[in-house]
């Protein structure tokens, strides 16, 4: 309901978004910075993620231990994550501790000191994260897949960076990055829960006053390229990832047409891929599809793992299902897909963690809050021809594939 939503701008331009949920006893806080891996140049690969780690490692007023103790003292859950388009610092606390949580978040965003000792320690932590990534076949095949989709463009690179770039970062690099991207024009503070909007604005005005106004970040537009990649690794199964140019955030009607297509094609146990590949042929335990949306680009992805000697048959059957998907969609399939999408959306509205992220992402992408009722209206207006047309547009494009398995499957 839009009447529960409020938005204000502080004197420095910081956007404050709240959604009142009076029936809960907690608040969920998201501080969204419009910066991620796609904003980095070649020398900065991995700095967004490294900076997110460093935010918890000491400020002008708190040591790393004191930050951890301050979080634990109010019994909250705090963390952060980095994507290609956003870096998000989030917390969930009891409503009575909202001001204390905001105080900690404001401190780590505005007053981090980036000591040489902590940089050296966190470098080792991230190197372990990269090593863990290299030991995970799913991570490897998806990294290869996105590298082929976007090649040397920022969206095709890992958010973790490389050992070479990470080793070059100093406190000056972090301070310069903060100065460029962590400003009022580029940050969104979104809060959902049992709160009073006006009180939040007053608190935020006090805590975030040192943020400079700044300018919104920009990035180089992404271009889907595509291609084929292979990783030679001896595993129990071969994993296959197929993809096509998908749908971006820009057009919500097209986006939700693609969501419905994905549900029908590979989004659940009644989906075509699941029924054909797993239930009928027994070729894979896990198989499915989804659309990854970015601001100006999208990737429609199909994934499955199978026995080494079944890869060719798996690929053939997926291709057969793709052809069928471009020809017809039944009324029953559309109804099931809409019900799934509607149920997921409506049940998510009950969680303040979801609402906080939803209003923040809405504003950072669209510059406005798009209500669940507006989204449902879009979903319910979609017809069979819309889904078939979307399928034809997506599946007629350049294919990208990535495979991880034994060397004799290369170029199967």
Curated annotation (Swiss-Prot):
Divalent metal cations. Binds Zn(2+). Disulfide bonds: none annotated. GO terms for biological process: proteolysis. Gene3D superfamilies: Metalloenzyme, LuxS/M16 peptidase-like (3.30.830.10). GO terms for molecular function: metal ion binding; metalloendopeptidase activity. It is an enzyme of class 3 (hydrolase). Keywords: Hydrolase, Metal-binding, Metalloprotease, Protease, Zinc. It comes from the Bacteria. The active site is at 52 (proton acceptor). Pfam families: Peptidase_M16, Peptidase_M16_C. Its cofactor is Zn(2+). This is Uncharacterized zinc protease RC0293.
